[in-house]
């Protein structure tokens, strides 16, 4: 069986998001979902923003300035509600008949605060569409469940493979459509 779900994992800063973005650029089909990018103020990282692959819309997900946020991961306050519109795009894509790749960057602690996140991710894994996602490396009940699915291939991004992965992944995704 060909694994239709691809999970990229690896150390922070190794290039998982870069692999996602380059893979999406190589695809001839459309992609629906989002990727996450660091927000920097000078050199230090002060937060993360989420960017829609469909519309280019950008919203902050977590920031050191979100001091009153109830949800927190380390020094970052999390605005989980900012992810809701991006989840809606993925849910709508799963009801269409359009050939496409679903993209979720990232399945991790900050995103878990968003109502409906677990359900949308689970539906994406069960859908007929190829899924390309990044996932936290550390053990977590939901993440371990996803990593151990029979229809999922977990690939660790390293300095040795990160430059070659986008072309290989794009070819594999195109073959599934």
From Swiss-Prot:
Cysteine-cysteine disulfides: none
Key words, A-Z: ATP-binding, Hydrolase, Nucleotide-binding
Gene Ontology molecular function: any one: ribonucleoside triphosphate phosphatase activity
Catalytic activity: a ribonucleoside 5'-triphosphate + H2O = a ribonucleoside 5'-diphosphate + phosphate + H(+)
This protein's record includes keyword rRNA-binding: no
Amino-acid positions noted as binding ATP in the UniProt annotation, renumbered to this chain: 10-17, 101-108
Top-rank EC class of the record's enzyme: hydrolase
Entry EC no(s): 3.6.1.15
Homology family: Belongs to the THEP1 NTPase family.
Job of this protein: Has nucleotide phosphatase activity towards ATP, GTP, CTP, TTP and UTP. May hydrolyze nucleoside diphosphates with lower efficiency.
Record's protein name: Nucleoside-triphosphatase THEP1
Organism expressing this protein natively: Natranaerobius thermophilus (strain ATCC BAA-1301 / DSM 18059 / JW/NM-WN-LF)
């Amino acid at each position: 069986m060909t694994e239709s779900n691809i999970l990229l994992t690896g150390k922070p800063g190794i290039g998982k998001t870069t692999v996602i973005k380059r893979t999406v650029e190589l695809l001839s089909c459309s992609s629906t979902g989002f990727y996450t990018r660091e927000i920097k103020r000078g050199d230090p990282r002060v937060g993360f923003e989420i960017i829609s692959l469909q519309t280019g819309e950008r919203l902050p997900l977590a920031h050191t300035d979100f001091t009153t946020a109830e949800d927190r991961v380390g020094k970052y306050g999390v605005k989980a509600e900012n992810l809701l519109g991006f989840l809606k795009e993925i849910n709508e894509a799963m009801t269409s008949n359009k050939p496409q790749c679903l993209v979720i960057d990232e399945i991790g602690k900050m995103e878990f605060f968003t109502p409906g996140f677990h359900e949308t991710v689970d539906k994406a894994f069960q859908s007929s569409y190829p899924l390309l996602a990044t996932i936290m490396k550390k053990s977590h009940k939901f993440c371990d469940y996803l990593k151990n699915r029979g229809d999922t291939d977990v690939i660790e991004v390293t300095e040795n493979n990160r430059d070659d992965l986008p072309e290989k992944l794009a070819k594999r995704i195109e073959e599934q459509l």
